[in-house]
Swiss-Prot record:
[4Fe-4S] cluster binds at C227, C298, C307, C314. Heterodimer of a small subunit (PriS) and a large subunit (PriL). It comes from Methanocella arvoryzae (strain DSM 22066 / NBRC 105507 / MRE50). Binds 1 [4Fe-4S] cluster. The keyword Thylakoid does not apply. The gene is priL. Keywords: 4Fe-4S, DNA replication, Iron, Iron-sulfur, Metal-binding, Primosome. This is DNA primase large subunit PriL. Belongs to the eukaryotic-type primase large subunit family. Signal peptide: none annotated. Its cofactor is [4Fe-4S] cluster. GO terms for biological process: DNA replication initiation; DNA replication, synthesis of primer. GO terms for cellular component: primosome complex.
Amino acid sequence: MDAVGFAKYPFTQEALSYVRDRNYSMEDILQKPAYGQVRLRAKKRVLNSIKGDVQADDLLPDPERELLSYPVARMLVAMTEDQYLMKRFALWESKRAYTLLLDESDTGLMDVGRDFGITARAKDREFIIHFTDYLRYAAGLRNLEWKLINRKVVAGMVYVSRETFTRLLEEAVREKIQAGFGAKVPAEMKPVLEPYLAEIRESLDKLKSEKGLSGDGEVTQDSFPPCMKNLLADLQKGINLPHTARFALTSFLANIGLDKDAIMDLYRMAPDFREDLTHYQVQHITGGSGTEYTCPGCKTMMTYGNCIGKNKLCEYVTHPLSYYRKSQRRRAKEMAAAQAFKGSKDKAVDTVAENVHVETGNSPGN
């Protein structure tokens, strides 16, 4: 792999060795004006991961800038201590890598695979890998096609298409990057990086607000409107939902940020669950066909008998998503008020304690 290859795949062990052999100093990269563009690119990598799109400059790298910006970007993400951003950054980097890997030669793909401990060989437009390597990275891919039983296996070796092998490498990249966020950023480096975090935090907070996510990036079910709570409860009880209810629930969950795999997991509880059909429906509703659908409004929900158990907040909204966002804002205000009350209460207790201490200190015999 050459310098351009290292820039495209900075998460590889080869790229790390290259940086070490060139004697780059992280202190210099973080502080010296000569590396200003590296730091700006690192910030942009993180911002792009929040936006979720791979842009032109992500695919046409300036080798040195691109390579060195990767560890700086990781440090910026780690400093937020935000699990949702860590997952999102790992996913974005893996998607970026996948786009680049699609243009690699067979040899290039096998080189990257080798870095992850995958020994592969190419034959007749297929890649042949050991079944243990296949299972290691296909385990997190829940679509029925990834089951080993649905693959061609000969003498312990799995035969996969070029695209499938590339998809496995994408998953390997995602897992490696996400697992690497356990290490803490050295304390002496934090002040230098802090100025780059303001825009990142602002962008992340905006995304979470738009998608109705809690602080840790999880969907807050407490804020669901009654109709969606009811549909989800039925699904969890093993009750089959009619098509209109499935469409409403799936589009609602996708609109507030739940990923496809998590939605698929919910439907596994249904008695009539079929992996292939459910996967097709979820893919179609969440944008696999080129259009991401918005969940139906309250009038449509009532028309199909899916509006159940209205409450007071329902009187002020005409759409399940409006209910969710209003509920999220209300919960945020309540939490802020509770925190402020706790702070004032603690302050009052401290004041009383201080007065008692003063009085005790002035009393006879002390």
